[in-house]
Each structure stands twice: as C-alpha cells, then as structure tokens.
Amino acid sequence: MEIITTNEALRAACDRLSTAGFVTVDTEFMRDATFWPILCLIQLAGPSDELIVDPLAPDLDLAPFYALMKNRNVVKVFHAARQDIEIFCHEGKAIPDPLFDTQVAAMVCGFGDSVGYETLVRKLAGGSVDKSSRFTDWSRRPLSDKQLQYAMADVTYLRTIYEVLAKRLTHTKRAHWVAEEMAVLQDPETYAMRPENAWKRVKARFRGQRGLAVLVEVAAWRERQAQERDLPRSRVMKDDALAEIATQIPRTISDLDGLRAVPKGFSNSRSAASLMEAVERGLAMKEEDIPVVEGPEPLPPGIGPLVELLKVLLKIKCEEHDVAQKLVANVADLELIAAHSEADVGALKGWRRELFGEDALRLKRGELAIGVKGKRIVLIETKR
C-alpha cells in the first residue's frame, strides 16, 4: 500500500493505472458541518497497485486523478458510486467514464436489493471487512495503520468482485442492462442541485398557490445560502421554519420574531433581509410561473386487482431472471401501467420492458394469464 502526498507520486501512480484495464475506486469524506463534502481520502487499486491519495496534503493537485477518471481506456469500478461521483462533479468537474457500479451489477446478478459491499466481499471474494474504523473522522491527521487498512479494503476486494460480476454479465448477456443504469449515474443532471428545485425537498403545507410560491422562493434562498456559505441546509434554516414562513407569510422582518420555528434573534441577522426579499419574490410571482403540484392520480375504479396481478408477475419474472425487483419496478410504476398501457415509466423502457414490461402489457390485454400448477405459480399463454 502506497500513501500518496506529492504531485510527483500522484502523476506516476496515475500514469501506471492508465495502462490498466480497470481501476477500483472509493473515497472517504466528511460533511457533518458543511454543505459540500470534504474529500479526505481517495483509494485506488489496479491489478498490481494499492494506493491511498491524501487530498488534504499541502499543495496536492488532483488533476492527474481526474484525468484518469475521464480516461476512456480504463474502466472505473465503484460500489454504490453516487456519492463519490457527486464529489468528483463538484471538486474536479469529472464524471468517471467508463463506469461500473458493482452494487447495480449485483442487483442484476441476483444478489437482492441494494446489496452491501460486505456481503459481496464474503460471497464473491471469500473475505471479510473489519468494520471497527467505520466511524473514523477522516479529516484528522495522522491516520493510524488500522484506519488506512480499513479504507484500502474498500477497493482491494472490489477487484475480485468486479471480475466475477463482469463475467456473469457477459455469460448472461446482461452487460447492456448495467450500461443503461450507468448512463443515469453519468448524467450531470443526476447531481445538479438547483436552488429553483429545492422546494421539492421540503415537506410542508402551504396556503394555496401563493403559499407555494413563497415556499419556492424561500427554499431557493436557503439552498443558495447553504451552498455559498458551505453550511448544511438545516444550519441555515430548518424545514419547519420554511414551512411556517410559507404558511404564515410574514410581511416584515419583525414578523419573523412571531414565528415559532424561526430561530430567536434571526431577525437581527444579516440574512433576515435577504430572506424577506425571497418572501416578496414569492408574493410577486406570476400565477403562470407557480409550479403545479399534482397529487397521485386516482386509480380507475376496479383496477386494484390488476395491480395485484402485476405484483405477482413482477415477482415471477424477477425470480425467473434472478434480478432484484427494486431495480425493475415499484408499486407506483405498476399502478401507472395498470391505468395506462403506454405509461411513461422505466418498467416499459429498455431492458426492463424486455424483462417485465412487455409481459405486463400482455397480461393487461388478456394475452397472458397467471395460473397454479401443483405448488407453482405459472404463466399461461391465452388464445386471444
């Protein structure tokens, strides 16, 4: 295991890894007191390299690492990649390409929903992971050998896991299924945190469309404040306070003092004026610019039994193909399919349609039936 703290060592390591067919990647980060995660360690492993990069080392330039992430000749292998990629998007404007996420691949290969790394280490690599350093403050220096070994284990076993899963995907001809999922993880929009959409994260009641307009603006205000000041959203203003502001709609800074969820003394802060400006923007928002909040569409009468049949079909198809149900469809998808033959849901697109969606539509049209044979539930072709 090599600990990299200098630009020269990082360039040399990335040059070596650039000739490998794949490199396994993981990170350790902290975001307890910040909006943006603080990148504390980067773990990398190639066929003959085991490296830990210290991003907190003085004057270390991570450009060679980000160039490696974009090197199309090297597959970047992660387990549950989303948070790692979010960091790379923010820090280095780099999205790994090509990308392989072993958690997604494992769900396609029959290991259940959101399978954990430790499970794959045990089942595919015949190893075990020491969890005793899991709650380490990774921003502290120096780190102990035990902590570094714990971090390194997140990528060393990953090499074997990747090789096993890649072979299974080739054998089952499902590599393109995983590729479709990787396209979502590689889409920059997956990681966009736009202030104008922040209201969707806030669970709040509001009075009519005008209250919603105020919520849109004050949630955007909080998002900008959190990003610019690098503070957790809750440290700027809690959801309860945003909800109360959207309900009560204060008109002056002093009105904020009468809201229970707004921190005492906030009206005297430098942020109070900008918050009230956000309230005013909400009050002035044109009717046509206020978002339309649509609740779940009521199911057509009598459609419940069809939804239940689709649940059974989903279970049958996922067990038959050894794929996690969660990856194929959820209840909301099934309800939409039951109500609309060409519903805009993932289960009717790409490999999901191939595995489940087409049969779901055939079941709905009466071309496929579900029956019982002995102790087994079976699918029966009809003559319609």
Swiss-Prot record:
The keyword Hydrolase applies. Residues 208-289 form the HRDC domain. Its EC number is 3.1.13.5. One of its GO terms (biological process) is tRNA 3'-end processing. One of its GO terms (molecular function) is nucleic acid binding. It catalyses: Exonucleolytic cleavage that removes extra residues from the 3'-terminus of tRNA to produce 5'-mononucleotides. Its cofactor is a divalent metal cation. One of its GO terms (cellular component) is cytoplasm. It is found in: Cytoplasm. Residues 1-170 form the 3'-5' exonuclease domain. It comes from the Bacteria. SUPFAM superfamilies: HRDC-like, Ribonuclease H-like. Keywords: Cytoplasm, Exonuclease, Hydrolase, Nuclease, tRNA processing. Exonuclease involved in the 3' processing of various precursor tRNAs. Initiates hydrolysis at the 3'-terminus of an RNA molecule and releases 5'-mononucleotides. PANTHER family: RIBONUCLEASE D (PTHR47649:SF1). Belongs to the RNase D family. This is Ribonuclease D. The gene is rnd.
